[in-house]
Amino acid sequence: MKLDKSRKLYAEALNLMPGGVSSPVRAFKPHPFYTARGKGSKIYDVDGNAYIDYCMAYGPLVLGHANEVVKNALAEQLERGWLYGTPIELEIEYAKLIQKYFPSMEMLRFVNTGSEATMAALRVARGFTGRDKIVKVEGSFHGAHDAVLVKAGSGATTHGIPNSAGVPADFVKNTLQVPFNDIEALSEILEKNEVAALILEPVMGNSSLILPEKDYLKEVRKVTAENDVLLIFDEVITGFRVSMGGAQEYYGVKPDLTTLGKIAGGGLPIGIFGGRKEIMERVAPSGDVYQAGTFSGNPLSLTAGYATVKFMEENGVIEKVNSLTEKLVSGIADVLEDKKAECEVGSLASMFCIYFGPTPRNYAEALQLNKERFMEFFWRMLENGVFLPPSQYETCFVSFAHTEEDVEKTVEAVSESL
């Protein structure tokens, strides 16, 4: 596989940007490839190689690359302008559409990133409860802000820095941690501390793919309510992915606050946080918890997000993508069994992960996965024309643009790569 131009570009980038990239997970060794364009289920690099893409920009592109409906909607909005600094009607229409699928979000606010959404949700929770301490799950990833950079997943774990330097100890002393799928540990920590909120990914997607065990989320809801602790579901990944109403609809659990992103922006930057009206009314200018942003609710992100969700609604996207994912995962599982490979495959909806080791149930078990073997597998898959997220700790995504032919080629690539 020829990657000469990508290699040269990366060498130049190393002198211009830390690690040569704008986000750490993109800096896989010995160098990343540079993308020239994307269309449908594929991306094409600057050296002319084509790849079936299961990274899908780490989740936002549920319709695939350069979807025509989204592209046309953006083109129409561009003719009218792309930033005003005033409210627009689409804010109202999109808010109502989101509430249709996330009724727990009685009021909501548009922001610019998932990180911004979780940061604001935690601030609101602290303001509403008058308490400082929060609880997060070990290995969960809620963005790159100080309160949650403690045993953080995603690129933080991939690059060996789950606890970031530069975060004051006095600040993170208010961030408590519990293992995923351990209701006893959660109960104990909530009973012993004055906690404002528990924030968690209902399905962990940044320490590989880790599913909640039976009734775990319902028990989480019960114990947080008993201790008067707000429950925040970080559905940046699972929102409009696990179901149209996210993991809270899929598992039948209603949080107090929810954060959305990724799919909700249709491939453009977005974050959304919302929840119970009495909590959200504390957000400025209605209340005393300040949050603001120049680009919040910008026309382009709202246009792409609204067009994406409407397309999903009108075309049964989730059902079709889930069905294709089942075929893909079944094919991979057959290959793993035939090869007697020391790895497993797990999935939920249109998310899947190939584990080089036993399927984990928490962060500690995810750390035991063989990340070196995974990266060997990653490069072999790339050579066979398939792009997976370049980390054992990331989740793969299937899109509406993927085809039966893509599935067949991917299963063949897995067989050859192993």
Swiss-Prot record:
GO cellular component: cytoplasm
Enzyme Commission code(s) on record: 5.4.3.8
Keywords tagged on the record: Cytoplasm, Isomerase, Porphyrin biosynthesis, Pyridoxal phosphate
Lineage: Archaea, Methanobacteriati, Methanobacteriota, Archaeoglobi, Archaeoglobales
Residues bearing the modification N6-(pyridoxal phosphate)lysine: K262
Needed cofactors: pyridoxal 5'-phosphate
Reactions catalysed, as given in the entry: (S)-4-amino-5-oxopentanoate = 5-aminolevulinate
Pathway(s) per entry: Porphyrin-containing compound metabolism; protoporphyrin-IX biosynthesis; 5-aminolevulinate from L-glutamyl-tRNA(Glu): step 2/2
GO biological process, one term: protoporphyrinogen IX biosynthetic process
Entry-linked InterPro entries: 4pyrrol_synth_GluAld_NH2Trfase, Aminotrans_3, Aminotrans_3_PPA_site, PyrdxlP-dep_Trfase, PyrdxlP-dep_Trfase_major, PyrdxlP-dep_Trfase_small
Domain of life: Archaea
Presence of the UniProt keyword Isomerase in the record: yes
One example GO MF annotation: pyridoxal phosphate binding
Main location: cytoplasm
Assigned protein family: Belongs to the class-III pyridoxal-phosphate-dependent aminotransferase family. HemL subfamily.
Annotated source species: Archaeoglobus fulgidus (strain ATCC 49558 / DSM 4304 / JCM 9628 / NBRC 100126 / VC-16)
Name used for this protein in its record: Glutamate-1-semialdehyde 2,1-aminomutase
Subcellular location: Cytoplasm
